[in-house]
Amino acid sequence: MKTRELILKLFDEAYEKKTWHGPNLKQSIRGVSAKQAAWRPGAERHNIWEETLHAAYWKYTVRRGIEGGKRGSFALKGSNFFPRPEKGRENEAAWSADRKLLEREHRALRKTIEAVVDTPRGRKFLRKIYGVAFHDVYHAGQIRLLRRLMGH
């Protein structure tokens, strides 16, 4: 298998394609309600909603690095973890909007990876590219654990 094929396969499996290791990131948030996404296992602990946006942010960060984009251009103000739900927005529409942000950032990064993976610039970023796939799998596992802890 060529590097291009392997990288795209890893990237796709970590987010949405069938895998041998269990649910990927997209499968892990499927069927989760806003109320469930907002549940915390304890004070000062992240919830599913925050983990979802965290994954979106790091997809953006890797893409921005590859493209040489401007810092601070993420759709949300802040970085890394975003407190959710926002006061007065503890609803399905807000949760759906944030899931769509994850999807958009994933699609944008995949498009960038496809364009550069075979170039010298792409090779320079290979570690971050496969790293973001591992990051998705890591957080998919956290989300699955949170779902079990809440009995879902």
Regions found by a protein language model. Give the residues of each.
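Short, contiguous alpha-helical
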Residues: K2-R4, L8-G22, K26-I29, A34-F82, ...
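Acidic/histidine-rich alpha-helical segments that form the ligand environment
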Residues: P83-P120, R127-V132
